[in-house]
Curated annotation (Swiss-Prot):
One of its GO terms (cellular component) is cytosol. The lineage of its organism: Bacteria, Pseudomonadati, Pseudomonadota, Alphaproteobacteria, Hyphomicrobiales. Residues 133-158 are annotated as: Disordered. Pfam families: SmpB. Required for rescue of stalled ribosomes mediated by trans-translation. Binds to transfer-messenger RNA (tmRNA), required for stable association of tmRNA with ribosomes. tmRNA and SmpB together mimic tRNA shape, replacing the anticodon stem-loop with SmpB. tmRNA is encoded by the ssrA gene; the 2 termini fold to resemble tRNA(Ala) and it encodes a 'tag peptide', a short internal open reading frame. During trans-translation Ala-aminoacylated tmRNA acts like a tRNA, entering the A-site of stalled ribosomes, displacing the stalled mRNA. InterPro entries: SmpB, SsrA-bd_prot, SsrA-bd_prot_CS. SUPFAM superfamilies: Small protein B (SmpB) (SSF74982). PROSITE patterns: SSRP. NCBIfam families: PRK05422.1 (NF003843), smpB (TIGR00086). It is found in: Cytoplasm. This is SsrA-binding protein.
């Protein structure tokens, strides 16, 4: 019997700026409603979600706005629009939590990463987040630098 291969997610796009610019609250995993050429283009790993966000519309549906999935090069005239809004697939309870966080607490829905799960499905990790002020960003940088320095000191000591 063959050994199971490790279940490593293939990350298609990551929003590394989000953890710097926002205080990340609760995270959610959502499915993405994509066309065939979008899936193929995502597998190449050239998508960008740094400037994107998600929003809940009046019908209670969540859409990913401003994410760029470039056109698939090998596709013909039936290619997709690179910046079109894409529907996110979530449970009703999760959508209610997201809309409540946005309306009452003044938070935003930020995408953290797009990846393919072990079944090959495209998933997106989104989070309710609150924007950081400049002094909060500086404080985060100081903590990170101190942790690096502390690690160096401990490593050099031993």
């Amino acid at each position: 019997m063959a050994a199971k291969k490790p279940s490593a997610f293939k990350i298609a796009a990551e929003n590394r700026k989000a953890r710097y610019n926002y205080e990340i609250g609760e995270t959610f995993e959502a499915g993405l409603m994509l066309t065939g050429t979008e899936v193929k283009s995502l597998r190449t790993g050239k998508a960008t979600i740094a400037e994107s966000y998600a929003s809940v519309d009046r019908e209670g549906e969540v859409f990913l706005v401003n994410a760029t999935i470039p056109e698939y090069l090998e596709a013909n005239r039936f290619n997709h629009a690179p910046k079109r809004p894409r529907k996110l697939l979530l449970h009703g309870r999760e959508i209610a939590k997201l809309s409540q966080g946005v309306e009452r607490q003044g938070m935003t829905i930020v995408p953290l990463k797009i990846y393919f799960n072990d079944r090959g499905r495209a998933k997106i990790e989104i989070a309710l987040a609150r924007g950081k002020q400049l002094h909060d960003k500086r404080e985060t940088e100081k903590k990170r630098d101190w942790n690096k320095e502390k690690g160096r000191l401990l490593r050099d000591k031993h």
